[in-house]
Curated annotation (Swiss-Prot):
Keywords: Disulfide bond, Glycoprotein, Pyrrolidone carboxylic acid, Secreted, Signal. It is found in: Secreted. This is Prolactin-inducible protein homolog. Residues 1-28 form the signal peptide. One of its GO terms (biological process) is proteolysis. Monomer. Interacts with AZGP1. Gene3D superfamilies: Immunoglobulins. The keyword Secreted applies. InterPro entries: Ig-like_fold, Ig_E-set, PIP. GO terms for cellular component: extracellular space. Disulfide bonds join C65-C91, C89-C123. The modification Pyrrolidone carboxylic acid is found at Q29. It comes from the Eukaryota.
Length: 146
């Protein structure tokens, strides 16, 4: 009987502690920063052999800078500036925008890829981080030729 009374006496304090811990854990989970935020823009449709400009805007919510390499991949081989790869230092206060100009005469799926890489001489003082969870981010669009 005495043990049961102790159990009920500790219960409100335990419940309050659990509630505080739960509220603290939820607040910490909501405060996660996005590693890469990307906006890939290409026209939805073009005429055959018309010049296409693809634009990829990249930013981060991390406080630290990262070295990123951006490039495009397509479902069919494309010529020209499509094959350019860009390497840049991406920081919270310095978003980047990349451009590719190319031609196509058939419908194609295009993926814009952002790799977080380890490379010296890109960020000031070589101060950059690499995320542990993932280091490749991509988005795809379809370009129709009509």
């Amino acid at each position: 009987m005495r043990l049961l009374q102790l159990l009920f006496r500790a219960s409100p304090a335990t419940l309050l502690l659990v509630l505080c811990l739960q509220l603290g854990a939820n607040k910490a989970q909501d405060n996660t920063r996005k590693i890469i935020i990307k906006d890939f823009d290409i026209p939805k449709s073009v005429r055959p052999n018309e010049e296409v400009t693809a634009t990829l805007a990249v930013r981060t919510e991390l406080k630290e800078c990262m070295v990123v390499k951006t490039y495009l991949i397509s479902s069919v081989p494309l010529e020209g500036g499509f094959n350019y790869k860009y390497t840049a230092c991406l920081c919270n206060n310095n978003p980047k925008t990349f451009y590719w100009d190319f031609y196509t005469n058939r419908t194609v799926q295009i993926a814009a890829v952002v790799d977080v890489i380890r490379e010296l001489g890109i960020c000031p003082d070589d101060a950059a981080v690499i995320p542990i969870k993932s280091n490749r981010f991509y988005t795809t669009e379809t370009l129709k030729v009509e």
